[in-house]
């Protein structure tokens, strides 16, 4: 990777880390085990389904997986196989595009285009428009989401990836895919009235909504598309979703995972998802209501979702037993959020620097990849592209990109 002049010592270390990571990725490959590997195969799916039906019997059924997750993470290989994750490919595409923009190296853009080509092949096969989900059956408390079902928490990342690459290298085919993604987001994904001004987005084309970050994702995608495509009709679809997110904020500034009376936990990366989307929307429309909500959110975030060492805490209100102290995914999303909002909220700058320094000091393995989790005892060192090798790669590339702009 070419050097960048006049950047901070921290950015120089990040550049070296990114160089080493891209070398590791080339050797390791583009499929990996996953956070859900314990429960993606037939044994894990049956155990998890039983847990949701009968807590007593289900707890006994999932106990071996939870034990392995806490003490022997490499046991994932006993339950499933490495898979390709579209959400990871989207993050890799964005990360390599950031590197191209920072380094002006055509090879990075070629790599980004490569991951877009992978996304074209892994779209949900049963839908007319471009959309993406998981390549495994996902057992949830509300039933099984079958492999190939579009997820509004995945498709927006593909939208961002295609849009970012298009802005670096315009291509008519990519624009058509962007337009297709937008049609899917506006029509296949549904919304449901929650107040006179608000509507909640569905998570898939088949559910009744309620998950806060789902509405945030949909609103941002449609707002961004409205500007890119010059289609103000998309704003009318997005606005009620924005209102739902704003109305879902708790009095203390936090956001629950869902407004369904059940999943009211507050965790790190879902909080980041909501605030990231609001931050991007605010930069598009300057809505003062959003800035006010973000101010309350940032205050809660900094006071409740960090450990004493300055690294992210998984939960401020946990829904269940937590078998780890810190997660790579939380760190990656923290970096993204701080980069998006540090100008509006300068107090995030020190958080940004602390988390990046912590990652570089303790989370980078000798082979160039990242540790996945700091467990109660030891580390989960299994590389998982969705959880969150790709997200950390993108967030550090985003940081380097921003540093080169300042330089």
Task: List the predicted regions and their residue ranges.
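Glycan-recognition and catalytic cores of secretory/periplasmic carbohydrate-active enzymes
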Residues: 1-407
């Amino acid at each position: 990777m070419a050097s960048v002049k006049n950047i901070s010592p921290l950015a120089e270390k990040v550049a070296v880390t990114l160089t080493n990571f891209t070398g590791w990725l080339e050797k390791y490959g583009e499929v990996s085990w996953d956070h859900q590997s314990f429960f993606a195969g037939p044994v894990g799916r049956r155990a998890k389904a039983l847990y949701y039906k009968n807590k007593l019997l289900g707890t006994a059924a999932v106990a071996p997986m939870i034990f392995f997750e806490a003490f022997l993470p490499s046991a994932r290989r006993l339950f499933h196989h490495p898979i390709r994750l579209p959400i990871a490919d989207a993050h890799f595409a964005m990360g390599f595009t950031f590197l191209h923009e920072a380094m002006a190296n055509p090879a990075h853009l070629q790599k980004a285009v490569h991951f877009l080509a992978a996304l074209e092949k892994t779209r949900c096969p049963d839908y007319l428009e471009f959309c993406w989900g998981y390549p495994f059956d996902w057992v949830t408390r509300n039933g099984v989401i079958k492999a190939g079902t579009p997820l509004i928490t995945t498709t927006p990342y593909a939208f961002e990836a295609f849009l970012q690459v298009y802005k670096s290298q315009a291509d008519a085919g990519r624009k058509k895919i962007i337009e297709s993604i937008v049609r899917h987001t506006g029509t296949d994904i549904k919304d449901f009235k929650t107040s006179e001004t608000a509507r909640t987005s569905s998570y898939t084309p088949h559910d009744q909504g309620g998950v806060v970050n789902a509405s945030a994702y949909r609103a941002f995608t449609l707002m961004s598309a409205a500007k890119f495509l010059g289609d103000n009709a998309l704003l009318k679809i997005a606005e009620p979703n924005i209102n739902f997110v704003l109305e879902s904020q708790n009095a203390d500034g936090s956001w629950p995972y869902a407004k369904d009376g059940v999943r009211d936990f507050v965790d790190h990366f879902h909080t980041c998802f909501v605030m990231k989307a609001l931050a991007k929307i605010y930069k598009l429309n300057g809505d003062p209501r959003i800035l006010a909500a973000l101010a309350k959110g940032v205050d809660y975030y900094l006071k409740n979702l960090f450990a004493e060492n300055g690294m992210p805490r998984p939960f401020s209100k946990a829904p269940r037993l937590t078998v780890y102290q810190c997660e790579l995914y939380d760190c990656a999303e923290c970096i993204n959020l701080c980069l998006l909002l540090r100008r509006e909220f300068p107090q995030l700058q020190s958080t940004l620097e602390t988390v990046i320094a912590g990652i570089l000091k303790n989370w980078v393995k000798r082979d160039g990849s990242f540790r996945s989790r700091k467990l109660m005892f030891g580390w989960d060192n299994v590389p998982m592209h969705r959880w969150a090798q790709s997200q950390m790669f993108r967030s550090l590339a985003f940081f380097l990109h921003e540093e080169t702009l300042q330089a």
